[in-house]
């Protein structure tokens, strides 16, 4: 019987680590449930594995690779040196090691995390995106021809809805200027200004490289009396449990759709996946 490949599991942590750190207590907490599930699955399937918490030292990763000699790296690192913007740099480093790894490659991560570049790429591939402009600090806000209020204002380089709230949706020029100035001052970066398109919040996981598989879609829902203009994934909607309970927000599997709509949803997700050069898995 062939030997099972050795798996090095990497995840990000908030402080410096060593090769021999013990994470058994951390893995008991709810915040570590993803890591716990992965390690439990590897154990149940009989894969030999080692774990390493990554903070800000790629040399430590190299040392663990030399010691453990993994056949594959299970990469769960989403930030480096406590910055989500550095995720692609860790993936680039891992790619240089020449060891197969899970998840998306560095090119796809870089393109997908840039809200402006990703929209330009999708437009090139004839995938509809809202009309948008970038408002840089110290410059006039010049809307594209045909852009109409309401608009939504976001930091260009943040993720996980950081910097997005109900105040991000603006109804007039005065509100637009105020929100753009807020983004400039608070986040020290450009503001993305785009048309606000009301609709449903749907998330689709996609797996694969050449042959893609769309996973069952998930939907974020609100209590019935919540107005339509408040139904979008702000930071509090995603991460503030008290806020979610107050507004009756929950995530569920998307109810069955008309077959044509379902096919269009999956085709669009697959086109986005390929257009942004994603691979492995993404959502």
Regions found by a protein language model. Give the residues of each.
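A short glycine-rich, hydrophobically flanked beta-strand micro-motif that places a catalytic Asp/Glu
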Residues: 54, 191-195, 202-203, 277-283
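Short small-residue beta-strand/loop micro-motif enriched in glycine and branched aliphatics
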Residues: 102-104, 160-163, 247
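A short, local hydrophobic-aromatic micro-motif
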Residues: 50, 102, 130-131, 215, ...
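Short acidic/His/Gly/Ser-rich catalytic and metal-binding motifs that mark active-site loops
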Residues: 16-20, 159-161, 242-245
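ATP-binding N-terminal substructure of ATP-dependent carboxylate-amine bond-forming enzymes
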Residues: 1-102, 106-107, 112-113, 124, ...
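Active-site nucleotide/adenylate-binding loops and adjacent lid/helix of ATP-dependent enzymes
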Residues: 4-11, 66-67, 109-192, 197-200, ...
């Amino acid at each position: 019987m062939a030997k099972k490949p050795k798996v090095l599991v990497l995840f990000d942590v908030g402080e410096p680590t060593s090769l021999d750190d013990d994470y058994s207590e951390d893995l008991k907490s709810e915040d570590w449930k993803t890591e716990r599930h992965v390690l439990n699955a590897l154990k149940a399937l009989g894969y030999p594995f080692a774990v390493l918490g990554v903070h800000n030292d790629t040399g430590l990763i190299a040392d663990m690779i030399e010691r453990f000699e993994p056949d594959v790296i299970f990469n769960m690192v989403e930030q480096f040196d406590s910055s989500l913007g550095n995720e692609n740099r860790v993936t680039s480093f891992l790619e240089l090691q020449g060891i197969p790894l899970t998840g998306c490659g560095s090119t796809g991560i870089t393109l997908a995390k840039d809200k402006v570049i990703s929209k330009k790429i999708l437009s090139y591939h004839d995938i509809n995106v809202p009309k948008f402009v970038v408002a840089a600090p110290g410059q006039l806000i010049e809307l594209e021809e045909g852009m109409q209020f309401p608009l939504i204002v976001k930091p260009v380089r943040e993720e996980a809805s950081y910097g997005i709230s109900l105040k991000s949706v603006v109804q007039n020029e005065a509100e637009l200027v105020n929100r753009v100035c807020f983004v400039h001052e608070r986040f020290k970066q450009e503001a993305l200004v785009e048309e606000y398109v009301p609709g449903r919040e749907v998330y689709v996981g996609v797996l694969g490289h050449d042959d893609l598989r769309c996973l069952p879609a998930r939907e974020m829902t609100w209590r019935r009396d919540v107005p339509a203009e408040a139904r979008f994934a702000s930071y509090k909607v995603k991460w503030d449990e008290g806020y979610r309970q107050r507004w009756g927000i929950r995530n569920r599997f998307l109810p069955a759709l008309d077959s044509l709509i379902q096919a269009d949803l999956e085709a669009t997700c697959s086109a986005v996946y390929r257009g942004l050069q994603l691979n492995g898995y993404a959502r």
